[in-house]
């Protein structure tokens, strides 16, 4: 039976709200004065470099910000106007805590949003956008809407970065004792945790609005293979 988009969304918001709420209570591992402190907040060097490159932009959006590590890095590298948004209240609480810890409250505005918030943003508002670990852990319908709206709200010279998890084939899933619903959706304990697509499938979803400038593969700490993806996109110019 097909899953309900709204039901999946509400379950996801509850899951991430609880996950990030637990982080608000423990920021003891973060020392803003330590060397490379903000670099260590990013899950990988590739993601750090992407966020840092947005420091030279005028107005940046960190969509699905989580604890807002990308927004923080962009601000610490020079961007004076960063918006960090997430539908999970716990994520925003965590983000605001980290933002205050680093003293960049005047540069970063973090707030909770609804799933249709992007539709309220004016055309060509941002010249930089980063969206990490979001598109492939939400219902595909919402992911495609985010891609469409992202093209509308960024300027012609904008740089966009989309970080994605690794591709999981049905065969690999089965070998690990898991099954993919509807061909590519992984649910764990009733929570949508992955919508698995190949590099080419993601490139095809971006293609109507964006050109792929680079595609990097990377690993999170502790992972042996660089299988996660980072797409650097540029908006296609009108013909």
Segments from the language model and where they lie:
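A short acidic, Gly/Pro-enriched loop at the edge of an enzyme's catalytic core
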Residues: 120-129
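A short glycine-rich, Lys/Arg-flanked "PGG" loop and its adjoining helix->strand segment in the class I
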Residues: 144-156
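A short beta-strand submotif of the Rossmann-like class I SAM-dependent methyltransferase core
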Residues: 131-134
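Conserved beta-strand/loop positions that form the S-adenosyl-L-methionine
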Residues: 63
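Class I (Rossmann-like) S-adenosyl-L-methionine-dependent methyltransferase catalytic domain
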Residues: 1-56, 66-118, 138, 142, ...
